[in-house]
A protein has these predicted regions:
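Universal eukaryotic N-terminal targeting presequences
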Residues: 1-4, 8, 14-19
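Cleavable C-terminal sorting propeptides in eukaryotic secreted/cell-surface proteins
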Residues: 5-7, 210-222
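Mature extracellular/extracytoplasmic regions of secreted and cell-surface glycoproteins
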Residues: 15-208
């Protein structure tokens, strides 16, 4: 009860940085109200939420179908035959929803949205999980992505050395600038959120260190 009263007071005085409605800021720091920049991958470990798509992006981009079209514009698509192996991961974005399972997982498509993700499942490549910040305490509408570069299936899809930083940077390189898919043209800009999460490997899945940075993308439909 005491914690709830404290939270209510902070909200009333605007001290949490977490208004209740969308369209105010691009995202809210998950840690402000008890969230984390690591998702829950099991065994007390997590993977970094190392890319954020701004809640001030074009609204269509932030929908499930709009995100998929944008993902295909930058080289990702649905999993092979829409089959997901393994348990979903969850994230707490500090929005009052607690730990929520990933919305979707998308994989590098190697130039073919229909079959390329099957190749990624075999030989490895880039992929990301999506979490939406939309709870009543911090409803930015932003999409938090856990991006990583993984090994082939013969290595159990483990993350490659430095795979969180490398996966993030590869996605951003593909996204920034003008991209087009299905007749929709996007312009994406990027900003580095330096030191937004702890540096190092403490609590990080596979014991792979991260540099502490996330990339903040704003995506506009032209």
């Amino acid at each position: 009860m005491f914690a709830q009263l404290c939270t209510a007071a902070l909200l009333a005085f605007g001290l949490t940085g977490a208004p209740r409605r969308q369209g105010i800021v691009g995202f809210y720091d998950p840690t402000t109200l008890g969230g984390s920049w690591l998702d829950n991958a099991g065994d007390g470990l997590g993977e970094p939420l190392n890319v954020v798509i701004s809640g001030l992006s074009s609204p269509q981009v932030l929908t499930d179908t709009g995100l998929l079209n944008y993902a295909e514009a930058i080289g990702f698509a649905n999993e092979c035959f829409d089959i997901h192996l393994g348990n979903p991961q969850s994230a707490n974005l500090g929005d009052g929803n607690g730990w929520v399972n990933q919305t979707v997982e998308l994989r590098q498509d190697y130039g073919s949205p229909d079959l390329g993700t099957c190749l990624e499942s075999l030989i490895g490549g880039n992929h990301f999980r999506v979490y939406r910040q939309n709870g009543a305490l911090a409803n930015s509408g932003a999409l938090f992505l856990a991006v990583s570069q993984e090994e082939p299936v013969t290595d159990n899809h483990d993350i490659i050395p430095n795979g969180y930083n490398l996966g993030r940077d590869a996605l951003v390189q593909a996204a920034v600038g003008v991209t087009t898919h299905n007749g929709v043209s996007y312009t994406t800009t990027a900003e580095t959120l330096v030191g937004i999460m702890p540096v190092g490997s403490t609590g990080v899945n596979h014991g792979i260190a991260v540099d502490g940075n996330a990339i903040f993308l704003t995506v506009r439909i032209n």
